[in-house]
């Protein structure tokens, strides 16, 4: 671990020679605003010493070089929507905001790609593509507030991953500022490339520890003109999970297959003031999206999907409107009705292990003093396990949560799973990554980090500790 220096007046003065003074913030209100991301547990909060808001890659490079000169840690922050403490300045130092890098530079309709700065909201990326009858397939639930650079940094997933893959599958190229302060372009808008190491893919998912993503080149594709959102309602969670392989084997190729257990259904309907949600008392929701380029194909696949769900035990199959999707997107926010502090895990397992994994979680949590909610991207094996602190003491919450998480991760790894499908590791899961990752793999990751960032300046304490 590096021995960092404190932020000094001299350091602040040099920052103000790199950036306009108004974009170098040391006032108490600003520092307090950026002491956390979506983390609600105040014990995890940490004040930065200074917040900077650069305008371009060159200014970012200057800040990085200065941090190396003074041995001051630097944490990059996008939209602040993460829930694993990845944008919290655990070591103090600098928090660097990407919000001024907010331009879409190019949308190439012939080449089917878009070039954008890293601070553009994901929703604006999607809208720009849609305006040209094109699709950017990345679609995390926080798309209205997260930034595209943060999506790359965590390799974000979302509701369309079952068909289109995760963020790394949507990226041709990135521009980064390295831990040395160099500006480097990695990748190119090519359909295939066998030319040296695939460095852009190494940066994607590295959570700001190997470089600061400043610009992205994203893959686009034709937008399917025909679409249906279906809501299949079950009473048995195993029956609900069981439709996934059948939908895939039938060749339906759904865009989304989303799962909400009944506690989520009840809490989100209350949170959104939607008392008329279907089967609110006992329904388990599976939301299925089908998109096609042909209306007859859509009708055929919709009928197939409905038949599969009914044969699997669905008590109702309906068309899902935006209120149902709003319920799905607000699963995390809605638990604020019952607990100020909660934690969301996003363990991922092979799709054929989903049913057993959920059964194991339901059985295991019965030993613990907190309520459970599960929502999931069941089409790609990614579960969101939401646990609420309620009135537990800090000590009891920490102890019981640690024991439960250890049990769940042990089971997941024994069945081919991993700690995170899309949220990343941050500092919250770093000790678990060190505990469960095979020693050879962990050592290789540490060697890469040390080679790229010998002073451990960028986002220290995230992913793993040095």
Language-model features, listed with the residues they occupy:
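N-terminal flexible segment immediately upstream of the FAD-binding catalytic core
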Residues: 1-65, 82-112, 264-275, 320-343, ...
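Alpha-helix capping/hinge segments and adjacent helical runs
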Residues: 20-21, 413-425, 454-458
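C-terminal substrate-recognition/cap domain of FAD-linked oxidoreductases
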Residues: 26-36, 233, 241-407, 411, ...
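Conserved, mostly hydrophobic/aromatic
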Residues: 67, 208, 453
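FAD-binding subdomain of flavoenzyme oxidoreductases
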Residues: 103-258, 458
């Amino acid at each position: 671990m590096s021995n960092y220096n404190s932020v000094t007046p001299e350091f602040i003065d040099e920052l103000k020679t790199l950036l306009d003074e108004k974009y170098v913030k040391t006032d108490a209100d600003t520092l307090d605003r950026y002491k956390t991301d979506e983390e609600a547990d105040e014990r995890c909060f940490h004040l930065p010493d200074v917040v900077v808001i650069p305008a371009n890659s060159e200014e970012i490079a200057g800040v990085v070089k200065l941090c190396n000169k003074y041995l001051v840690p630097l944490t990059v922050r996008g939209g602040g929507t993460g829930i694993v403490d990845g944008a919290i300045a655990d070591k103090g130092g600098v928090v660097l905001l990407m919000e001024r890098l907010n331009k879409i530079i190019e949308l190439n309709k012939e080449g089917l790609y878009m070039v954008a700065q890293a601070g553009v909201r994901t929703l604006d990326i999607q809208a720009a593509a849609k305006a040209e009858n094109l699709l950017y397939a990345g679609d995390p639930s926080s798309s209205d507030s997260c930034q595209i650079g943060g999506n790359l940094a965590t390799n974000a997933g979302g509701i369309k991953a079952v068909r289109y893959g995760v963020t790394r599958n949507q990226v041709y190229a990135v521009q980064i500022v390295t831990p040395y302060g160099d500006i480097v372009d990695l990748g190119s808008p090519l359909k295939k490339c066998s030319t040296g190491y695939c460095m852009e893919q190494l940066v994607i998912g590295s959570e700001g520890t190997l470089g600061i993503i400043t610009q992205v080149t994203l893959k686009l594709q034709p937008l399917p003109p025909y679409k249906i959102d279906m809501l299949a309602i079950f009473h048995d969670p195993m029956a609900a999970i069981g439709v996934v392989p059948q939908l895939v084997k039938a060749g339906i190729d759904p865009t989304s297959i989303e799962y909400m257990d009944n506690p989520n259904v009840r809490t989100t309907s209350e949170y959104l003031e939607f008392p008329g949600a279907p089967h609110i008392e006992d329904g388990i929701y599976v939301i299925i999206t089908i998109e096609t380029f042909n209306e007859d194909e859509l009708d055929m696949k919709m009928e197939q999907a409905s038949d599969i769900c009914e044969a699997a035990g669905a008590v109702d199959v309906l068309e899902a409107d935006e209120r149902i999707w709003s319920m799905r997107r607000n699963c995390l926010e809605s638990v604020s009705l019952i607990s100020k502090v909660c934690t969301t895990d996003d363990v991922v397992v092979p799709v054929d292990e989903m049913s057993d994994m959920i059964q194991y979680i339901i059985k295991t949590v019965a030993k613990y003093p907190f309520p459970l909610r599960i929502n999931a991207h069941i089409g790609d094996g990614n579960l969101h396990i939401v646990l609420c602190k309620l009135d537990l003491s800090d000590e009891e919450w920490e102890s019981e949560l640690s024991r439960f998480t250890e049990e769940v991760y042990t089971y997941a790894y024994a069945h081919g799973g991993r700690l995170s499908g899309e949220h990343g590791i941050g500092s919250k899961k770093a000790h678990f990554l060190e505990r469960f990752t095979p020693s050879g793999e962990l050592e290789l990751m540490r060697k890469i980090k040390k080679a790229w960032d010998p002073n451990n300046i960028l986002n220290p304490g995230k992913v793993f500790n040095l």
